[in-house]
Amino acid sequence: MSMMTSTPTKRSVKLDDIWPELEEGIYKIITDLNKGFPKQKWIALYTHVYDYCAASQSKSSAKVGMPKQQASGANYVGEDLYNRLNLFLKKHMSQLLKLTETKMDEPLLNYYYTEWDRYTSAMKYINNIFQYMNRYWIKREIDDGKKEVYEIFILSLVIWRDCLFTPLKQRLTNSLLDIIESERNGYQINTHLIKGVINGYVSLGLNREKPKETILQVYKSGFEELFLTATENYYTNESAKFISENSVADYMKKVETRLNEEVKRVQQYLHQNTESELIAKCEKVLIEKHVEVIWNEFQTLLEKDKIPDLTRMYSLLSRIPRGLEPLRTTLEKHVQNVGLQAVSSIATNGVIEPKVYIETLLKVFKKYNELVTGAFRSDTGFVASLDKACRRFINENAVTIAAKSSSKSPELLARFTDFLLKKSPNNPEESEMEQLLNDVMIVFKYIEDKDVFQDFYSKMLAKRLIHGTSTSEDLEGTMIGKLKSTCGYEYTSKLQRMFTDMSLSRELLDRFNNHIEQVERSSLNIDFSVLVLATGSWPLQPPSTNFSIPKELQACEQLFQKFYQNQHSGRKLNWLHHLSKGELKTKYLQTSKSGYTLQCSTYQIGVLLQFNQYETLTSEEIQESTQLIDSVLKGTLTSLAKSKILLADPPLDDEEIAKTTKFSLNKQFKNKKTKIFINVPVLTQVKEEIDSIHKTVEEDRKLQIQAAIVRIMKMRKQLAHSGLMTEVISQLQTRFNPKVNIIKKCIDILIEKEYLMRVEGKKDHYSYVA
């Protein structure tokens, strides 16, 4: 048996009693809120809504024994009030719509935006009046799945959308598009108005699941799609007309301006999500559709060095797929041709100065590197094109073709480096040297035969160290450091050991001098120094001739030989007289009381000291006393005669020196300088040295190729011919480009030596023989 209980009741509130006052207040708020609304009136309206919705609680009842949650469920009312407000708002929309019938374009937009702003502001106010209904009756209806029920402010937007916006949508959108087009045509527009109307499109994108958020469906379907189509049509027509009447450079400026305008347009009054689609549409119409015309202008702009236009072209074409690829190819060909022409212009006489050659290469590189890093923003594709072009014109050009050798570039680069690092009145300032050495490394990066550079460089470094002609050891160390960072430790290991030998030689010479003073208790009577250099580290050739050292120098050599053998009993000294030098003091001249100091090679010293005993000597007599071979003797006598230290009888010409040619000291010798350098290198010796280096390089390459083949096959065990060729080239191309025919010969050599064998049954396959 159940028992009913009653609760105290509240006064019943009828809708018809409260609605007239609610309607009057709502109308006042909707139409004239800007004049203010009394707080007491607001409280009264809120109380009406509260009383009406809460009145049903007094009618609720509970049964004894009912579950708690069931008993507490409130039967709030509100449907009639909700429907009454719904009808009121729809009637208001109908009145607003009627007032738009004669309006179009900006007047229509002005009216619409004014009413929208008034309406949304008012409905936020009214929403607060109906807050109690929102929290209880409306929430319950929504929770129960009623699709047609909304919170009051959302309801107001739904009614605006369905009753006013939808009928006006086409006229509104057309008006917006017309005004935006007029702005594109250069007219001033009210961007605040446009932004306000468009924001209304966005606000009407209601999200049922998340009422406080909007979706862009209304904005996209009602405005954005039509706007993008209008944009495409506008720029299709404009671009076709403009490019037919103006230059490509002017067209690119126009496109750049238009793209910037569209970005600004989004910022001023469009939704931010529109930007990506809008710009993509503009890029397709303004750039992609005219890309062939733009590509075709690139070569002309390169030739005329139109940097601003090239910068703009890169910026525009980088926006579209594959827009830059033809430019990269064109740039590569252009730079290669410019480089080849530049080298050809300085190679007309067949003789090229290293400084002129390297500066010419660098001038081309720097010009286009500045273009790539600046206008093309260090784009990796353009960097690669520049690298390919430089590699081609640096390794194969008029100079290398004339020399019939791609190794000419590394040789000239080594000579240019020697020019920088060797003492000279023309040496650059030390502050400039770091940049100049960096310039050397730029060209070094592109030369293919880095082993040729290494051989020439080490040869020249050896001469600078032996003859003491380096600008500074710090700069020498800097250059070696740069080579090491580029090519690794192995590339510079011998160069670094050369410096070690120089340091050890200085220490050894100090000990020798102490030994002479303290042990031998004698004086050498001459200023004697010696460098002890390890054979494996120095690129030095043994002398090509015998040489009978003058008796004046014999004591020095013998004492040092004895001292060194006592220090290092297991080592052997080989004297390199052809690299040695010294100074002689003249005491025979009638023209100078103080005399001259002659800086000579040891061979020249050997010849000149003969004249301490004899007034005149024939070539044959000099050869007998010095033991020099004909070619070396001729070069030595020629250099002394050309320096006018010796007089020849008969005078020398380009023919061979006869054995009977007589030589005597020129006692009338005069020179403005007191210290005279006569160790002039002979051109034939330089040529022989170059030939020797190239021969050494070729032999070294064969050994390196064989070593690479063995390494690869030891790891792979078995490999096809093509695969082996590819791996060998890959391993060695950082030092030089191995030629295919040389690799084949090296494979045959290794098969003969039984390091490799051909695989039976498999054509062109090799296996490693353990």
Swiss-Prot record:
Pathway: Protein modification; protein ubiquitination. InterPro entries: Cullin (IPR045093), Cullin_CS (IPR016157), Cullin_homology (IPR016158), Cullin_homology_sf (IPR036317), Cullin_N (IPR001373), Cullin_neddylation_domain (IPR019559), Cullin_repeat-like_dom_sf (IPR016159), WH-like_DNA-bd_sf (IPR036388). The keyword Ubl conjugation applies. It comes from the Eukaryota. Keywords: Isopeptide bond, Ubl conjugation, Ubl conjugation pathway. Residues 700-761 form the Cullin neddylation domain. There is a cross-link at residue 714 (Glycyl lysine isopeptide (Lys-Gly) (interchain with G-Cter in NEDD8)). GO terms for biological process: cell differentiation; chemotaxis; G1/S transition of mitotic cell cycle; protein ubiquitination; sorocarp development; ubiquitin-dependent protein catabolic process. One of its GO terms (molecular function) is ubiquitin-protein transferase activity. Disruption phenotype: Cells are defective in inducing cell-type-specific gene expression and exhibit defects during aggregation, including reduced chemotaxis. Neddylated; which enhances the ubiquitination activity of SCF. One of its GO terms (cellular component) is cullin-RING ubiquitin ligase complex. Probable core component of cullin-based SCF-like E3 ubiquitin-protein ligase complexes which mediate the ubiquitination and subsequent proteasomal degradation of target proteins. The E3 ubiquitin-protein ligase activity of the complex is dependent on the neddylation of the cullin subunit. Required at several stages during development. CulA and fbxA regulate multicellular development by targeting regA for degradation via a pathway that requires erkB function, leading to an increase in cAMP and PKA activity. PANTHER family: CULLIN. Belongs to the cullin family. Part of a complex that includes culA, fbxA and regA. Formation of this complex is dependent on the MAP kinase erkB. This is Cullin-1. The lineage of its organism: Eukaryota, Amoebozoa, Evosea, Eumycetozoa, Dictyostelia.
